[in-house]
Amino acid sequence: MKKFKSFIALDLKSNTQNISIVKKLYLHVYGFKVGYRSFYNNRSNELISEIKRSKCKLFLDLKLHDIPNTVSSAIDSLSNINPDFLTLHISGGKELSLIHI
């Protein structure tokens, strides 16, 4: 089966629906993008676990933007999830461009 180099956005209100999409499409895509609504859902752990089980890439689109120290702390708190990609807005200053993820 051909696997496309694309991400599927999982931005539905229901994580049950998001998980269903992962189970149906994981063989065909490169990864899944999880945004605010899906990530801050009270069942996001299930969604993240399903993406990890699928062996697809995880893109957390949380648009981290604040002062450098706060963004760095946010990234540290996400390290247990180990996302493959993360949205980081660096308009907070030169220090943000030096953060190692």
Task: Give short role names for the model-derived ranges.
Residues 99-101:
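Conserved small/polar residues in nucleotide/adenosyl-binding loops
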Residues 1-95:
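Conserved N-terminal beta1-alpha1 strand-loop-helix module at the mouth
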